[in-house]
């Protein structure tokens, strides 16, 4: 994996994923509750997020240069048109490389809103304190950090950006989600 410039992780649960055979990048399907598919299987908790965090901590030392995380749907309201067309577009890499946040770009078209109403839930659940605070400190120093960011967890991220945090961060996030999420 480490030699790949781009690698796609498709989070799969129950949809038709035949479209994946048409994407130009190497890819792997990430399953839910399929022990025979290990290491590409995660508990059915927290939707695609457990797939993302499990992949990042398990493959931390051999990550591709850039990882593209997508959901199982070729067509969905949160991305424009066909995911095949989006991933195969000659504009995808220039879009990613020109992102305001180096090493990260959302490929969704729906922006997030204000985080402020969600902060009490993040604190009450223990999520921020147990997973984020050791690395980022007090949540209130970040102001409105979600406003207009791409929603729905489909994105491209560089190995360098992932490794700006230790492997333990991703493992802790995965474990917290598995222990504290209702099956999805």
State where each predicted segment sits.
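ER/Golgi luminal nucleotide-sugar-dependent glycosyltransferases, focusing on the catalytic module
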Residues: 1-184
């Amino acid at each position: 994996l480490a030699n790949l410039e781009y690698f796609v992780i498709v989070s799969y649960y129950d949809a038709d994923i035949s479209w994946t055979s048409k994407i130009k990048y190497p890819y792997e399907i990430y399953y839910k509750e399929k022990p025979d598919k290990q290491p590409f299987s995660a508990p059915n908790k927290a939707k695609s997020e457990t797939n993302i965090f499990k992949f990042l901590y398990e493959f931390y030392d051999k990550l591709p240069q850039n990882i593209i995380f997508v959901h199982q749907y070729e067509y969905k309201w949160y991305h424009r048109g066909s995911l095949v067309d989006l991933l195969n577009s000659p504009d995808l890499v220039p879009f990613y490389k020109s992102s305001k946040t180096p090493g990260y770009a959302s490929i969704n078209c729906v922006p997030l809103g204000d985080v402020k109403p969600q902060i009490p839930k993040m604190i009450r659940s223990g999520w921020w304190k147990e997973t984020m605070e050791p690395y980022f400190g007090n949540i209130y120093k970040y102001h409105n950090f979600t406003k207009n960011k791409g929603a729905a967890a489909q994105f491209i991220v560089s190995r360098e950006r992932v490794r700006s945090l230790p492997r333990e961060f991703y493992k802790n996030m995965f474990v917290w989600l598995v222990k504290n999420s209702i099956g999805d």
